[in-house]
Amino acid sequence: MSAYNALNDVPCTLNAWLLTKVLREDWGFKGYVVSDCGGPSLLVNAHKYVKTKEAAATLSIKAGLDLECGDDVFDGPLFSAYRQYMGTKAEIDSAAYRVLRARMQLGLFDSGEKNPYTKISPAVIGSAKHQEVALNAAR
């Protein structure tokens, strides 16, 4: 997840150095990056970093943001930006690919009997061992 704040005067939602150079290239992250809820809209309304939601959508995608929490910018404004040649199909496809790949790996497109995660009972998920792991991760 990106963040609401800025790093080195660049909002994290569209910070290519952070999302692509550090996260993907240096650290080898292969997953997808989702914004904080409403984060791309804040590029216009709060950060005043860009003037339009189309610019927010385009620059976020180019920087390595794959999914918006909410649908204020990656819905109509992204499509509008694409029609105005502000972004490329390849950039949008890369973001969509990363999101869909993760969902496929989680079995979200499989039927219930093929998805191993549907067989994990709440008793296992909430077990003392798992609670201990979660507590240690939070520390």
Task: Describe each region flagged by the PLM.
Residues M1-R139:
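Glycoside hydrolase catalytic-domain context in secreted enzymes
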